[in-house]
Amino acid sequence: MNRHTDTHYPSLADKVVLISGGASGIGRAFVEAFVAQGSRVAFLDLDAEAGQGLAHALGANSLFLPCDVRDIERLKACVAEVERTWGAVDVLINNAARDDRHALADVSVEYWDERMQTNLRHAFFAAQAVAPGMARRGSGAIINMGSISWMRGRPGMVCYTTAKAALNGMTRTLARELGGQGIRINSLVPGAIRTERQDAMWAADPAGLEAASQAFIDQQMLKFRLDASDCARLALFLASDDSRGCTGQNFVVDAGLSIQ
């Protein structure tokens, strides 16, 4: 049983899926959900221990490749390895990102560039690398992970919100550029998603975690805490043939948090 959804998508069986940042959090939920659909899932991550452990648990339909997505040559090499192993990528999910907080006055040129490498640049070059194979097949789906933070103008993370806003523009432009080749590109935009990383950050203060969770729920239209499975359900739909008419769009899963 797929713990992320009871829905089965026949069109995802045997599809080759590539996910960055797949060893933990939302990315891990993606990996597990697609493997449960019968897809062949390659995933990238910096955390080799977590990645190898997940691949071992999931079996032959998963492939972990250690990768720092800031290293574009390594990223391209990983795409090539997936293609050698399973053939052209059918579904790409550009998930890797970090939303570290930072003060405006503390941002250096070096920090700015590193944040763009972490949160934006790799998404373009991953799409560039998989697009030829998708075009040869006449189909493909690319999902870019957005954020409601730029929609809300959230302070204290301007490098992150800038990168995520730019990713929205990239999604729309590439959707138009590649649509004639049967390639669909959409953004999946999460709201306040509870993950293992957040739980670890609040481990010494469980009451604080619950208070923070309740604060998000109070701002949402729907009164429950979202988790990674909510994103995984939407990703499966956007990757499947059921969403064949959807491209160039933002699909928001935030329980109404971004509506002010």
From Swiss-Prot:
Catalytic residues (UniProt) = Y160 (proton acceptor)
UniProt pH dependence: Optimum pH is 8-9.
Pfam families associated with the record: adh_short_C2
| GO molecular function annotation | oxidoreductase activity
Q: What induces it?
A: Is highly up-regulated during growth on sulfoquinovose, compared to growth on glucose or succinate (at protein level).
Its domain of life reads: Bacteria
Which top-level enzyme class is recorded in the Swiss-Prot or TrEMBL entry?
A: oxidoreductase
Listed EC numbers: 1.1.1.390
- Role summary: Catalyzes the oxidation of sulfoquinovose to 6-deoxy-6-sulfo-D-glucono-1,5-lactone, with a strong preference for NAD(+) as the electron acceptor. Is involved in a degradation pathway of sulfoquinovose (SQ) that allows P.putida SQ1 to use SQ as the sole carbon and energy source for growth.
Protein name, please? Sulfoquinovose 1-dehydrogenase
Organism, by scientific name, is: Pseudomonas putida
